[in-house]
């Protein structure tokens, strides 16, 4: 995630020449103070103050410059005074970076004894931002609005959350996804229009032969494998058969070789997300379980069975949640515990669940895998942390992409499961099991999802809105009749 350190957000402050030089100097001084304060609080992305925007020509020049500045991830616009919005038409029409409208004002409180018309003219965000907001709406331009005083903790949190989405948007527009093999045969939802995805999101998806990956795996040096195995021993609880001298020790060494070869291939090609499928493993000793789990923990996106849309979304949410404590993972609704009025989803996958979500130190084990026809694969076994969470997916409906995000309550495991050989999570659906399940299925939600304990639906909505894709939110107040209407209306709106 080193690229995040290079990013910047441009702060554009609107006014007009009508107020005169002294007032404009004060506007800029106030904007500079706000910028310095926000940057002093370690924002996710640093803010760069630009010259005042007081004429149509100024605004157009700044917006064009933002488009062409590679490291500019987005733009914050604030109307300190009134800034006639027709001046903003040319610039906003051309701006293609994410936009945040910052509805704040320099002074937190009205100076009751001193306030006069000079003060009123200088501090006009209350109606200056309404003028600006009208034009953004008139142009049908997506934007995030943050309301509140610039020194408040809630504003800092809102700005940081928006910046995290910016980083994910930036990354998607530069992302390369590698596919090893094709889709799992006859599976529908993992298919999709890769050309349209590149047009809409910016990321590219290309396929590579398993032999190319195998060549990379076979080129790994023995000393590098030994170093990685020591890392395994330090980070995880190894079962006896994988410890030095154990009867399955060679399988652990093979896993290390696969991990290093896979990472080398991805890094050489600049890929930050990838897919594989158990039906295309020619030349490999085992399906990559542990290697995929560890690469996800390092920030790579992943989708099983050729699911490139989910691989890209895992990567996006990995970027959004960089530095946060609870993790996210590729995931699948697997089976249910249907106790009356206490239904629980057991979510997992064959192998590939990211240990960033683990509650405790994972167990590194080796177990048979009934599909794929290869040697027993190593894998990390653990239970997810508990807490508020989301499950998200993107599906291709033929004429558009739809993102679906469901709010969840991840819970501690109800009972021990000594024979379950995979990483897993337990959750309860919002608003209840029946409604939440029906809502996901009605919306066409995939059987794969991205499970996150850090990223909420509002952030994912912002992500979807920027790319102009449909967003369906399943939450504690979801009513099926309302959802059916929303889906019906969206079919018309997105034609």
Swiss-Prot record:
Its EC number is 5.3.1.4. Keywords: Arabinose catabolism, Carbohydrate metabolism, Isomerase, Manganese, Metal-binding. InterPro entries: Ara_Isoase_C, AraA_central, AraA_N, AraA_N_sf, Fuc/Ara_isomerase_C, Fucose_isomerase_N/cen_sf, Lara_isomerase. Its cofactor is Mn(2+). Pathway: Carbohydrate degradation; L-arabinose degradation via L-ribulose; D-xylulose 5-phosphate from L-arabinose (bacterial route): step 1/3. GO terms for biological process: L-arabinose catabolic process to xylulose 5-phosphate. Binds 1 Mn(2+) ion per subunit. The keyword Transmembrane helix does not apply. GO terms for cellular component: cytosol. CDD domains: L-arabinose_isomerase (cd03557). The keyword Isomerase applies. It comes from the Bacteria. GO terms for molecular function: L-arabinose isomerase activity; manganese ion binding. Mn(2+) binds at residues 305, 332, 349, 448. It catalyses: beta-L-arabinopyranose = L-ribulose. HAMAP family: Arabinose_Isome. Catalyzes the conversion of L-arabinose to L-ribulose. Belongs to the arabinose isomerase family. This is L-arabinose isomerase. It comes from Actinobacillus succinogenes (strain ATCC 55618 / DSM 22257 / CCUG 43843 / 130Z).
């Amino acid at each position: 995630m080193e690229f995040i350190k290079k990013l910047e957000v441009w702060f554009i402050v609107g006014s007009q020449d009508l107020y005169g030089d002294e007032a404009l100097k004060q506007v800029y001084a106030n904007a500079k103070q706000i910028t310095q304060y926000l940057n002093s609080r370690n924002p996710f992305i640093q803010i760069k103050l630009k010259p005042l925007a007081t004429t149509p020509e100024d605004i157009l020049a700044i917006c064009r410059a933002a488009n062409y500045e590679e490291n500019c991830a987005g733009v914050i616009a604030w109307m300190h005074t009134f800034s006639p919005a027709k001046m903003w038409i040319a610039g906003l029409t051309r701006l293609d970076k994410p936009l945040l409208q910052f509805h704040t004002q320099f002074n937190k409180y009205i100076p009751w004894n001193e306030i006069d018309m000079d003060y009123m003219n200088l501090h006009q965000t209350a109606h200056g931002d309404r003028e600006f907001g009208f034009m953004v709406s008139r142009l049908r331009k997506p934007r995030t609005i943050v309301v509140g005083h610039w020194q408040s903790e809630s504003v800092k949190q809102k700005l940081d959350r928006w910046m995290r989405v910016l980083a994910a948007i930036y990354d998607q527009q530069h992302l390369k996804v590698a596919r090893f093999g094709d889709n799992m045969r006859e599976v529908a939802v993992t298919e999709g229009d890769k050309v349209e995805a590149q047009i809409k999101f910016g990321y590219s998806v290309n396929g590579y032969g398993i032999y190319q990956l195998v060549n990379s795996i076979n080129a790994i040096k023995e000393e590098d494998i030994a170093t990685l195995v020591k890392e395994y021993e330090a980070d995880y609880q190894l079962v006896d058969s994988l410890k030095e001298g154990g009867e399955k020790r060679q399988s652990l060494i093979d896993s290390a070789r696969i991990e290093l070869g896979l990472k080398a291939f991805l890094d050489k090609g600049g890929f930050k997300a990838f897919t594989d499928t158990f039906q295309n493993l020619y030349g490999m000793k085992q399906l990559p379980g542990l290697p995929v789990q560890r690469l996800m923990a390092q920030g790579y996106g992943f989708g099983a069975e050729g699911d490139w849309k989910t691989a890209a979304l895992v990567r996006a949410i990995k970027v959004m949640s960089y530095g946060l404590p609870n993790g996210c993972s590729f995931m699948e609704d697997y089976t249910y515990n249907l106790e009356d009025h206490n239904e629980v989803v057991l979510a997992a996958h064959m192998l590939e669940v990211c240990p960033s979500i683990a509650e405790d130190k994972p167990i590194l084990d080796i177990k048979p895998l009934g599909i794929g026809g290869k040697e027993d694969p190593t894998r990390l076994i653990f239970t997810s942390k508990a807490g508020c969470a989301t499950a998200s997916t993107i599906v291709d409906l033929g004429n558009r992409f739809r993102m679906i995000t469901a709010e969840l309550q991840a819970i501690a495991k109800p009972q021990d499961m000594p024979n379950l050989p995979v990483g897993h999570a337990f959750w309860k659906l919002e608003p209840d099991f029946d409604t939440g399940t029906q809502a996901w299925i009605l919306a066409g939600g995939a059987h794969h999802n991205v499970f996150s304990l850090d990223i909420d639906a509002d952030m994912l909505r912002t992500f979807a809105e920027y790319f102009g894709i449909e967003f369906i939110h399943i939450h504690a107040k979801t009513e099926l009749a309302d959802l059916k209407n929303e889906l019906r209306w969206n079919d018309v709106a997105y034609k």
